[in-house]
From Swiss-Prot:
Gene3D superfamilies: QueA-like. Keywords: Cytoplasm, Queuosine biosynthesis, S-adenosyl-L-methionine, Transferase. GO terms for molecular function: S-adenosylmethionine:tRNA ribosyltransferase-isomerase activity. It holds the Pfam family Queuosine_synth. It catalyses: 7-aminomethyl-7-carbaguanosine(34) in tRNA + S-adenosyl-L-methionine = epoxyqueuosine(34) in tRNA + adenine + L-methionine + 2 H(+). Transmembrane segments: none annotated. Signal peptide: none annotated. This is S-adenosylmethionine:tRNA ribosyltransferase-isomerase.
């Protein structure tokens, strides 16, 4: 039904945020009301988010922590390589992307960061297995570089190491930040708590596939990358309690939404209620998808033709999102990972909204 071109738009390059603002909650927030015709918008500061949420509503955060997953290195022959660790698979093993003039075969030794050697193991398309000489996480955090998105043009510095990480990051494993969470700081949490807004966390380790472009015009043919996630029982209980009192579940970021909806979809398919789970998901949310859990979404502005733009269009309505993005561009909002945020409400008729 939909093609890639349906999710394209022209973005002035100067609106791509290259650095984070000095204060997390100083970013802007576009509150979108898709229930009106046409959609209406409120231009806010992110610090005003607590005013947009009701007591008893539940905010769901992704507590993944970004790894220093990028390495420059070389082969024994001297050939230069670049490694991006995608996923930790054991204490001393990981899956990684490797950029090299020639694909390394099993047994190839690579020198990373001029500090330690790894050995290439079996190929697990599109990744390579890497065997580390010691604890992966320790070596990655000591010698790796922060994997900033490809559209950010500067090398990571100490400011990025703080600001490309949420203040509540707990579980190391992501190679990209759950960026909607970057706007939250202690002052916002204090005001949310004072208002009686509930908070809970899940974990989804964001993979590098989040930046992979869609290369097929028929989006139904797109092959979605897979990511690991975990929903704890405490979150399942909080969602049930939120529903019981008539409040709303608000996902902070598309990664939180994907984890919640993947778990609910799989539970539905098995004829069971939502339950605690730890699993892989390659859920691909496009217009026409039936949302089961999430009522509202805090999210940043996404790339043209991206799967995340398709997701927000499925959630809030295609025309609503198009209008919101036009409003944001005209209003000089900042886009992508270090950019501003929007607050969306689920449309019951997203195909026509």
């Amino acid at each position: 039904m939909f093609t890639l071109s349906d999710f394209d738009f022209d973005l002035p390059p100067e609106l791509i945020a290259q650095t984070a603002l000095p204060e997390r909650s100083a970013s802007r927030l576009l509150e979108v009301n898709g229930q009106t015709t046409p959609a209406s918008f409120a231009d806010r500061r992110f610090a005003e988010l607590p005013e947009c949420i009701q007591p008893g509503d539940l905010l769901v955060f992704n507590d993944t922590k970004v790894l220093k997953a990028r390495f420059l290195g070389q082969k024994a022959s001297g050939g230069k390589i670049e490694v991006l660790v995608e996923r930790l698979t054991g204490e001393r093993t990981a899956l990684a992307q490797i950029r090299a003039s020639k694909s390394p075969g099993p047994g190839t030794v690579l020198r990373l960061a001029d500090a330690f050697d790894v050995t290439v193991g079996e190929r697990v398309e599109p990744f390579y297995t890497l065997h580390f000489p010691d604890d992966c996480l320790t070596l990655i955090e000591q010698f790796g570089r922060l994997p900033l998105p490809p559209y950010i043009e500067h090398d990571p510095d100490a400011f990025d190491e703080t600001r490309y990480q949420t203040v509540y990051a707990q579980n190391p494993g992501a190679v990209a930040a759950p960026t909607a969470g970057l706007h939250f700081d202690d002052s916002i949490f204090a005001r949310l708590d004072a208002k009686g807004v509930e908070r809970a966390t899940l974990t989804l380790h964001v993979g590098a596939g989040t930046f992979q472009p869609v290369r097929v015009e028929n989006i139904a043919e797109h092959k979605m990358h897979s990511e690991w996630y975990q929903l704890p029982q405490s979150l399942v209980d909080r969602i049930a309690a939120t529903r019981a009192r008539g409040n709303r579940v608000i996902a902070v970021g598309t990664t939180s939404m994907r984890a919640l909806e993947a778990a609910a979809r799989d539970a539905d398919a098995a004829g069971k209620p939502l339950a605690a789970t730890s699993a892989e998901t390659d859920i691909f949310i496009t217009p026409g998808y039936k949302f089961r859990v999430v009522d509202r979404l805090v999210t940043n502005f996404h790339l043209p033709k991206s799967t995340l733009l398709m997701l927000v269009s499925a959630f809030a309505g295609i025309e609503t999102i198009r209008a919101a993005y036009r409003h944001a561009i005209d209003g000089r909002y900042r886009f992508f990972s270090y950019g501003d945020a929007m607050l969306l409400t689920r449309s019951e008729d997203a195909l026509n909204a």
